[in-house]
């Protein structure tokens, strides 16, 4: 009985150590989430600056506008990839926590069964000792999950706005290209008409000049 009780206590201690390791991983995820939030804020500021620059975009070369759109697309893809990786890490961490919780409950049950005929205070002390630690870990995980969900919601909202802005810019760019093509065609047509008129008037001007000289 004593051997079994010691084994159960050792297993419980091992589970607590694993919980501490996962708690460290949770803190790392929280730091990454905080960093992502800062990047989202930086992206928001960047978009505000882009909005100001778009007001004078028509006075700049088309290549500058295209480069700005390409840079914005690249940043959006990077944020989407980082958001996806953080979301995957959160799911993996929660799955690991659920597995550890299941193992912990199993160990506590075995301890209860092994200590059924022993002093009940041992069971009570062990349960109180680990319940507090487990509750602290659960609260940290819930806090991390809340922060992650908020970051994901903010990120998705910003991405939707960015996609709409990009579509508007692409539509405007297409319209500018079309207007540029029309202007070029009109210029070439007028140039061709001027050349034709000059050619047809040349003999008439020459004849008139000769008549005036004879007079």
Swiss-Prot record:
Domain of life of the native organism: Eukaryota
Keyword terms, alphabetized: Coiled coil, Cytoplasm
Source organism: Danio rerio (Zebrafish)
UniProt key word Transmembrane helix: no
Protein localization: Cytoplasm
Family (UniProt): Belongs to the SIKE family.
UniProt xrefs under InterPro entries: SIKE
Name of the protein in question: FGFR1 oncogene partner 2 homolog
Disulphide bond pairs: none
GO biological process, one term: response to wounding
Pfam families, per the entry: SIKE (PF05769)
Recorded coiled-coil stretches: 35-183
GO cellular component: cytoplasm
């Amino acid at each position: 009985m004593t051997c079994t009780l010691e084994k159960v206590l050792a297993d419980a201690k091992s589970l607590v150590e694993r919980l501490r390791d996962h708690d460290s991983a949770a803190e790392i995820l929280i730091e990454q989430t905080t960093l992502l939030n800062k990047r989202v804020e930086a992206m928001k500021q960047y978009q505000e600056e882009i909005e100001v620059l778009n007001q004078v975009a028509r006075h700049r070369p088309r290549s500058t506008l295209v480069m700005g759109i390409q840079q914005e697309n690249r940043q959006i893809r990077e944020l989407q990839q980082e958001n996806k990786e953080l979301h995957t890490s959160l799911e993996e961490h929660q799955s690991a926590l659920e597995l550890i919780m299941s193992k912990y409950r199993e160990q506590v049950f075995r301890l209860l069964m092994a200590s059924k005929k022993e002093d009940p205070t041992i069971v009570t002390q062990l349960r109180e000792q680990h319940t507090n630690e487990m509750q602290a870990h659960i609260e940290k995980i819930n806090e991390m999950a809340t922060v992650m969900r908020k970051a994901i919601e903010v990120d998705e909202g910003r991405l939707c706005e960015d996609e709409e802005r990009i579509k508007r810019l692409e539509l405007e760019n297409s319209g500018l290209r079309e207007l540029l093509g029309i202007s070029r065609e009109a210029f070439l047509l007028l140039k061709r008409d001027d050349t034709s008129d000059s050619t047809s008037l040349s003999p008439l001007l020459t004849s008139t000049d000769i008549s005036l000289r004879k007079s």
